[in-house]
């Protein structure tokens, strides 16, 4: 049966594509150089210090350790930890079994965070809690440290309303008679092996999303770098004037965006093979005697919202990774957001986008069924050729080619819509698991999260039933091979099992697509019957 055979081909192509993509990614990563990193970055580790301050605007809440001024914890107030939780999602965390921090400081010959000193500055603040008020345009949180030689270091965290980017500003006043030379650095470090309580993957679906490091440079707009590469000391050492460094997981990102002070160094490193580090170091910054210098950088801690990330740094929005089919996923996402702005429900937006896509591909679908009908009409002649030249396979092929030419039929014409639909299906899959806007997005009744699997498996069963109806309409009477007929009859069950762990939004798309197929199939076939 042609339709069911097409489903089988679709599944095969889907799995093959994902395996090929994983292989390509691994091959690319293996080409990276294995460079040794300056050991100054290894000393910056967790030290117990009870002195902390708390900073909050309306979307993020930060905990800053006054020893070094690192961001040790960050909660995203607009996102729940889990679907039914009242707690906000904690992106950065410092615990006994898991560390995820955003660190920054001044290193080099005269830097207070330099490994030469084997310590970091212990900053002070005038209070412990800082909250952005309802009518305030920005919140400035200064912390200060005075060195032994009288140099004043002021590190200021600047937050704005409804913004996930935090400006980090160093104000260094040098009252001495000698110049100071230092570098600003920013790095992100994270425990490689996740504890069970911190599972960032969606549902039980086997195709996990990327969790690891990433960067942007003069030569590469966006590159991912696996934690495994860092753990095996296959480290990055890249000189670049532009760019950023980041750590990514499904839906969320932490990124340092350095100020353009010349050529920065992007590096990776491993601490005890269990903690991955990616960071940047600026060129040497000279602070003349009796003068002050302002040194800036920016930190993103939040969801991967494309339109906001694009404003913070060039190419940062590319961390919303739609894979190889980004050129399809991006316009699909834009169309989906337009529909959502009108309808107000992501599920109904998916249904509407399904109708739109199936409407656009209708000419191909019609051509497919016409080709299938012609092929079915030719079956007696094809069978006659096979019986007549049963002992000569080459002659059978030649005669069948001549028959196709005579009848003006392309035997592969029925497969074209499948090749068109597969990229659409894949791009929608990547969009659903990669767009934070769809995280915990409800539809109707029991479907409270379109980005995760149906908790009761109702949608996959409905999808299987729609396949069964397509099978009944198409009929399998023309299939002579008993084994092939059994396989085709069993396809709805196979696909139902295959879709159990798919995001419910994707299963919804396939259900609607199948219903459209049933309607289009009955309409086209009935017209063909009338025109005979």
UniProtKB/Swiss-Prot annotation:
GO molecular function, a single term: membrane insertase activity
Known role: Required for the insertion and/or proper folding and/or complex formation of integral membrane proteins into the membrane. Involved in integration of membrane proteins that insert both dependently and independently of the Sec translocase complex, as well as at least some lipoproteins. Aids folding of multispanning membrane proteins.
Localisation: Cell membrane
Keywords tagged on the record: Cell membrane, Chaperone, Membrane, Protein transport, Transmembrane, Transmembrane helix, Transport
Superkingdom of the organism of origin: Bacteria
Keyword Transmembrane: yes
Stored InterPro entries: Membr_insert_YidC (IPR019998), Membr_insert_YidC_N (IPR028053), YidC/ALB3/OXA1/COX18 (IPR001708), YidC/Oxa/ALB_C (IPR028055), YidC_ALB_C (IPR047196), YidC_periplasmic_sf (IPR038221)
Family label: Belongs to the OXA1/ALB3/YidC family. Type 1 subfamily.
Pfam families: 60KD_IMP (PF02096), YidC_periplas (PF14849)
Transmembrane segments: 7-27, 336-356, 413-433, 450-470, 492-512
Presence of the UniProt keyword Nucleotide-binding in the record: no
Gene Ontology BP annotations: protein insertion into membrane; protein transport
Protein name listed in UniProt: Membrane protein insertase YidC
Subunit relationships: Interacts with the Sec translocase complex via SecD. Specifically interacts with transmembrane segments of nascent integral membrane proteins during membrane integration.
HAMAP family for this protein: YidC_type1
One GO cellular component term noted in the UniProt record for this chain: plasma membrane
Bilayer topology annotation: Multi-pass membrane protein
């Amino acid at each position: 049966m042609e339709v069911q055979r097409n489903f089988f081909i679709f599944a095969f192509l889907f799995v093959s594509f994902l395996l090929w993509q994983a292989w390509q990614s691994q091959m690319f990563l293996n080409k990276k150089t294995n460079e040794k990193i300056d050991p100054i970055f290894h000393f910056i580790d967790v030290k117990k210090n009870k002195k902390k301050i708390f900073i909050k605007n309306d979307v993020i809440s930060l905990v800053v350790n006054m020893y070094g001024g690192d961001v040790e914890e960050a909660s995203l107030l607009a996102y729940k930890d889990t679907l039914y939780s009242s707690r906000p999602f904690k992106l950065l965390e410092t615990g006994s079994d898991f560390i995820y921090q955003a660190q920054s400081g001044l290193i080099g010959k005269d830097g207070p965070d330099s490994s030469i000193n084997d310590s970091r500055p212990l900053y002070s603040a005038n209070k412990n809690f800082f909250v952005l008020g309802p009518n305030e345009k920005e919140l400035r949180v200064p912390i200060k440290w005075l060195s032994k030689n009288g140099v004043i270091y002021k590190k200021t965290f600047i937050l704005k309303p409804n913004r996930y980017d935090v400006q980090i500003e160093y104000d260094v006043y040098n009252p001495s008679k000698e110049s100071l030379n230092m570098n600003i650095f920013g790095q992100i470090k994270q425990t490689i092996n996740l504890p069970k309580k911190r599972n960032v993957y969606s549902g039980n679906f086997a195709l996990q999303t990327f969790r690891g490091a990433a960067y942007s440079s003069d030569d590469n707009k966006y590159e991912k770098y696996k934690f495994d590469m860092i753990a095996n000391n296959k480290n990055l050492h890249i000189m670049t004037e532009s760019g950023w460094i980041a750590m990514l997981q499904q839906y969320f990102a932490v990124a340092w965006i350095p100020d353009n002070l010349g050529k920065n160094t992007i590096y990776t490193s491993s601490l005890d093979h269990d903690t991955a580090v990616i960071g940047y170091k600026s060129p040497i910054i000279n602070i003349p005697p009796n003068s002050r210098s302002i040194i800036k950088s920016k930190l993103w801690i939040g969801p991967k919202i494309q339109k906001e990330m694009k404003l913070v740094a060039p190419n940062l929005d590319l961390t919303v990774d739609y894979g190889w089919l980004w050129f399809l996923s991006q316009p699909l996402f834009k169309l989906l957001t337009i529909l959502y702005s009108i309808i107000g429900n992501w599920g109904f937006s998916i249904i509407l986008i399904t109708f739109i896509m199936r409407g656009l591909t209708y000419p191909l679908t019609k051509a497919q069924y016409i080709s299938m009908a012609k092929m079915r009409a030719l079956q007696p002649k094809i069978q006659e050729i096979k019986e007549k030249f049963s002992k000569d396979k080459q002659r059978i092929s030649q005669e069948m080619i001549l028959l196709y030419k005579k009848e003006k039929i392309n035997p592969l014409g029925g497969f074209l819509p499948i090749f068109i639909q597969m990229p659409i299906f894949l791009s929608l899959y990547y969009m659903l698991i990669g767009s934070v806007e769809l995280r915990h997005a409800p539809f109707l009744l029991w479907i409270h999260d379109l980005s995760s699997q149906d908790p009761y498996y109702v949608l996959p069963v409905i999808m299987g039933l729609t396949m069964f109806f397509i099978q009944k309409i198409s009929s399998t009477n023309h299939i002579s091979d008993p084994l092939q007929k059994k396989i085709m009859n069993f396809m709805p069950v196979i696909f139902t099992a295959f879709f159990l762990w798919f995001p419910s939004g994707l299963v919804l798309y396939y259900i609607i697509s199948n219903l459209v197929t049933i309607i289009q199939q009955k309409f086209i076939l009935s017209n063909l019957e009338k025109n005979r």
